[in-house]
């Protein structure tokens, strides 16, 4: 005998003080799934490159921020048109209305329509006619 008294097997804390497991998203304070993003990164990495957990958290935070930004602008566009549901048209108006998002998102949005655009030369003629009257 080693003389150390009763020895229980295993390492760590006793079972009565075991805490519940928390997700990576909860620890990072995010709504988007960090574990899923990490899995996608690992799957798409070439030559079995190692993917750090902080890179998945950072990418998830960026995706969550961009989504929140687009949804906020689209919600404002829907509110301006006095409707309660965001449609692809509202997303189109929100993205094309913001210069930075327009540069970032070059994709075509299905059923988004087109932005109304009137050439400045045509606007000047209308304003001159109004001033003459």
From Swiss-Prot:
Keyword Nucleus: yes
Molecular function via GO: chromatin DNA binding; identical protein binding; protein heterodimerization activity; RNA polymerase II cis-regulatory region sequence-specific DNA binding; structural constituent of chromatin
Region (Disordered): 1-30
Gene Ontology biological process terms in this record: CENP-A eviction from euchromatin; nuclear-transcribed mRNA catabolic process, non-stop decay; regulation of transcription by RNA polymerase II; silent mating-type cassette heterochromatin formation; transcription elongation by RNA polymerase II
The keyword DNA-binding is assigned to this record: yes
Compartments, record wording: Nucleus; Chromosome
Post-translational modification: Acetylated once deposited into chromatin.
Domain of life: Eukaryota
Oligomeric and partner information: The nucleosome is a histone octamer containing two molecules each of H2A, H2B, H3 and H4 assembled in one H3-H4 heterotetramer and two H2A-H2B heterodimers. The octamer wraps approximately 147 bp of DNA. H2A or its variant H2A.Z forms a heterodimer with H2B. H2A.Z associates with the VPS72/SWC2 subunit of the SWR1 chromatin remodeling complex. Also interacts with RBP1/DNA-directed RNA polymerase II largest subunit.
Protein family: Belongs to the histone H2A family.
Protein name stated in the entry: Histone H2A.Z
